[in-house]
């Protein structure tokens, strides 16, 4: 049986159409992917992302433990700060990409991808040294994402703190949304400004309804996984299983900024990632824009000078650009801007060119 989030019973009320997403029954859309995408880019959207995993790390050795496992430098995090990072195998392949929240000295929360929860927790448990506790709290926590240029104004009306003061990648874990206690962080996965709200399962419906009611006049709409994917894709935010995997390193995927090879602590995968950072990886994640008519899709082969150079990781018709575009992991010789390549679509090789990414960048 598919897993369900605490908000499942509300989906129908708002017109949600559900799909099987990695063993979860989640809404792919409420109105339409295009409308929801547009709302987040211009007004605001609300997502149920309660399927994401949360892991609590505590103990006096929690910092050295995280420094060993994660590619970013956790020692730079202050209380109330969040950091994007990756967890890698010794060969540099990616176990997961995740967020680390520092709640207090020796108290951290990791937010991990739903499909990777068991694998990630097993990996962490295998590497425990000293005074470290790893607790999977995924089933106790719901997560809502309020995203878009009007997100701040909407949240301001119902939150007890002035959350406008939160800078990106900062959070408050003593916030109240309506009458509900929550952790609110200025983070997201859309390329827009926004907030992620962590609360107890039993409080999720209350926050969901309150936000949608409060934001109605500002154009806030409920959004599904379809728009979440097109939004993150335009902003070139990687999705595990597509742009990142056990066979793709963070450097290849273009998130080298989250790999600190100069941090004082050694970490798993460092040798390979340091070499790729210094000398360049053999493959690179690049943007494609179709010249011929066709939409590049995940897994489609890409050819350069008659030979396969890699494949598409994600592709669609961009709702913002109104163009058929894709991300592709290609051999470095095929990656120069304006290089013409061919994408195999329905047994035909169609022309595309390498373009700049991200496809969309929010204007401050």
Swiss-Prot record:
It catalyses: N(6)-[(R)-S(8)-aminomethyldihydrolipoyl]-L-lysyl-[protein] + (6S)-5,6,7,8-tetrahydrofolate = N(6)-[(R)-dihydrolipoyl]-L-lysyl-[protein] + (6R)-5,10-methylene-5,6,7,8-tetrahydrofolate + NH4(+). InterPro entries: GCS_T, GCS_T_bac, GCST_C, GCV_T_N, GcvT/YgfZ/DmdA, GcvT/YgfZ_C, TrmE/GcvT_dom1. Its EC number is 2.1.2.10. Pfam families: GCV_T, GCV_T_C. Keywords: Aminotransferase, Transferase. It comes from the Bacteria. It is an enzyme of class 2 (transferase). GO terms for biological process: glycine decarboxylation via glycine cleavage system. One of its GO terms (molecular function) is transaminase activity. GO terms for cellular component: cytosol; glycine cleavage complex. Belongs to the GcvT family. HAMAP family: GcvT. The glycine cleavage system is composed of four proteins: P, T, L and H. The glycine cleavage system catalyzes the degradation of glycine. This is Aminomethyltransferase. The gene is gcvT.
